[in-house]
Amino acid sequence: MNIHEYQGKEIFRSMGVAVPEGRVAFTAEEAVEKAKEFNSDVYVVKAQIHAGGRGKAGGVKIAKSLSEVETYAKELLGKTLVTHQTGPEGKEIKRLYIEEGCAIQKEYYVGFVIDRATDQVTLMASEEGGTEIEEVAAKTPEKIFKETIDPVIGLSPFQARRIAFNINIPKESVNKAAKFLLALYNVFIEKDCSIVEINPLVTTADGDVLVLDAKINFDDNALFRHKDVVELRDLEEEDPKEIEASKHDLSYIALDGDIGCMVNGAGLAMATMDTINHFGGNPANFLDAGGSATREKVTEAFKIILGDENVKGIFVNIFGGIMKCDVIAEGIVEAVKEVDLTLPLVVRLEGTNVELGKKILKDSGLAIEPAATMAEGAQKIVKLVKEA
């Protein structure tokens, strides 16, 4: 689950992580009123959308007067902002974050992530702040420093200080930086985050260490422990199909292709998309039906896939373990009838009750193309979509 920058900074502030003063605004008039509350001559007007790259896309403005705050607010509100993370359709700006300006001395990058290779939380940091960390990793990987954190001990003060020294935090600010990192780690753990990224972290002329921009993602599987976090969810920033999928316990992510996919298991789903790509097709989505799909769930999955007007064909790839192939087959037949499917449909079943499942599909009299393997199924759906 994602939240807005201003919401993340409120969490930081409440847990002892230093951030500049800021207020959220929904109108240009409100933006000016919020700016008046600051003891500053410089203000930062920031578009609030669930995507990075806002600065490069023109979504962050520096205002040196209240009149400029109003001008920038009017310019941004209602605008569709396109960044490298939004896709070409962009996202509409519906709210702004008005922040007090600060005298930046140097920008840095700091992030806490879960390292799948070590199964531990890793602190990453670089003195190349303000740019995409992927770009730094590609061009100057030697400028990225890491600390692997023992889950029993947590982030140690000496690790925080070592990172601060490695990224050349000024000596007079090292202790503040270490305290900052320890507080940030506490946010990561206490709020069950999957990522906490500060880019940039800044030191100021006054020797302070502050969050200038932040990204927080939460582990969806832990949200039941954080009702306060769930309340921060902005459904207007999410794909309606993804929202509908979550209601039916389906994992759905929209992509920009034209072949809809319904699979059980995240690993098989990714392998299916890779296979479609290998044979020259483009997946329209990632959809994991999970291990306990019912007929109703399969029907809802079809409806969600067909909610994407770009879909020109569907590939169902199911391995029946807990999920029995005959139940899936019955669900597919019912779904095809209910949604009155006219698009090409290829189904590959394997596992428990597979022969019974195949018989149900064959006896249905519907235009369902069977496939014996994932590769065969991918080839068939790519061919059918191209011929359609």
Swiss-Prot record:
Q: Which InterPro entries match?
A: ATP-grasp, ATP-grasp_succ-CoA_synth-type, ATP_grasp_subdomain_1, Succ-CoA_synthase_bsu_CS, SUCC_ACL_C, Succ_CoA_ligase-like_bsu, Succinyl-CoA_synth-like
- Keyword Ligase in the entry? The reply is yes
Question: Where does this protein act, in terms of pathway?
Answer: Carbohydrate metabolism; tricarboxylic acid cycle; succinate from succinyl-CoA (ligase route): step 1/1
Keyword vocabulary terms for this entry:
ATP-binding, Ligase, Magnesium, Metal-binding, Nucleotide-binding, Tricarboxylic acid cycle
State where Mg(2+) binds.
199, 213
Q: Which GO terms describe its biological process?
A: succinyl-CoA metabolic process; tricarboxylic acid cycle
- Nucleus as UniProt keyword: no
Q: Where does ATP bind?
A: 46, 53-55, 99, 102, 107
Query: Molecular function terms in GO for this entry?
Result: ATP binding; magnesium ion binding; succinate-CoA ligase (ADP-forming) activity; succinate-CoA ligase (GDP-forming) activity
Gene3D superfamilies to which the protein is assigned, alphabetical: ATP-grasp fold, A domain (3.30.1490.20), ATP-grasp fold, B domain (3.30.470.20), Succinyl-CoA synthetase domains (3.40.50.261)
Q: Required cofactors, per record?
A: Mg(2+)
Q: Which Pfam families match?
A: ATP-grasp_2 (PF08442), Ligase_CoA (PF00549)
Q: Name the chemical reaction catalysed here.
A: succinate + ATP + CoA = succinyl-CoA + ADP + phosphate; GTP + succinate + CoA = succinyl-CoA + GDP + phosphate
Q: Entry cofactor note text?
A: Binds 1 Mg(2+) ion per subunit.
Q: Which GO terms describe its cellular component?
A: cytosol; succinate-CoA ligase complex
Q: Assembly state and interactors?
A: Heterotetramer of two alpha and two beta subunits.
Family that this chain belongs to: Belongs to the succinate/malate CoA ligase beta subunit family.
Say what the protein does: Succinyl-CoA synthetase functions in the citric acid cycle (TCA), coupling the hydrolysis of succinyl-CoA to the synthesis of either ATP or GTP and thus represents the only step of substrate-level phosphorylation in the TCA. The beta subunit provides nucleotide specificity of the enzyme and binds the substrate succinate, while the binding sites for coenzyme A and phosphate are found in the alpha subunit.
What is the protein name stated in its UniProt record? Answer: Succinate--CoA ligase [ADP-forming] subunit beta
> What is the native source organism of this protein?
Staphylococcus aureus (strain bovine RF122 / ET3-1)
Q: Species lineage, top-down?
A: Bacteria, Bacillati, Bacillota, Bacilli, Bacillales
- Gene name of the record: sucC
